[in-house]
Amino acid sequence: MIEHNPTTIYGTTIVTVRKDGKVVIAGDGQVSLGNTVMKGNARKVRRIGKGNVIAGFAGATADAFTLLERLEAKLEQYPDQLMRASVELAKDWRTDRYLRKLEAMMLVADSKATLALTGTGDVLEPEQGVMAIGSGGNYALAAARALIETDKSAEEIARKAMNIAADICIYTNHNIIVESLDAQ
């Protein structure tokens, strides 16, 4: 049996789907401290920049907000260039002593690109327009990949994937927040 540190904040699930001219990021609202649900309606998916980028985060909340702020600063420096801003953030993440200790991951998307920014400073693009992170990420990813070839919309796929993850992962709930953008 796996022992969990009761003072560590665990889990969330974030999924992104890009399909048929839409890009969606969805996330649940649960915040757990050890084996206790501390909050069920946290907002882990939001619009950043000028509202033309959506982001979802998993991991330590304070760390995630630090990274969101840094990404917003990079987007101001490189307007309408999500890939460039993300790569520049990743460079900082890998070289800055303070940032290297941050324990968070993010999925970000604009009309042109969907990216995962990992805790090791990697910038990854999804296969098949689908990617997921967090404690229920593998469940959401499997569900979304199974549904991507159906006639369901990007939002329907993301919601179904999140509900499946919430049914399986104890650190994920059914309070799902969705943000979407028109995609190229």
UniProtKB/Swiss-Prot annotation:
Native organism: Brucella ovis (strain ATCC 25840 / 63/290 / NCTC 10512)
Known function: Protease subunit of a proteasome-like degradation complex believed to be a general protein degrading machinery.
Gene Ontology BP term (one): proteolysis involved in protein catabolic process
Residues reported to bind Na(+): A166, C169, T172
Source organism, top-level taxon: Bacteria
EC code(s) of this entry: 3.4.25.2
Active-site residues, as the UniProt record annotates them: T12
UniProt-recorded name of the protein: ATP-dependent protease subunit HslV
Molecular-function annotations in GO: metal ion binding; threonine-type endopeptidase activity
Subunit details: A double ring-shaped homohexamer of HslV is capped on each side by a ring-shaped HslU homohexamer. The assembly of the HslU/HslV complex is dependent on binding of ATP.
Gene: hslV
Catalytic activity, reaction form: ATP-dependent cleavage of peptide bonds with broad specificity
SUPFAM superfamilies: N-terminal nucleophile aminohydrolases (Ntn hydrolases)
Family stated for the protein in its record: Belongs to the peptidase T1B family. HslV subfamily.
Subcellular location: Cytoplasm
A Pfam family it matches: Proteasome
First-listed, main subcellular location of the protein, grouped into a coarse class: cytoplasm
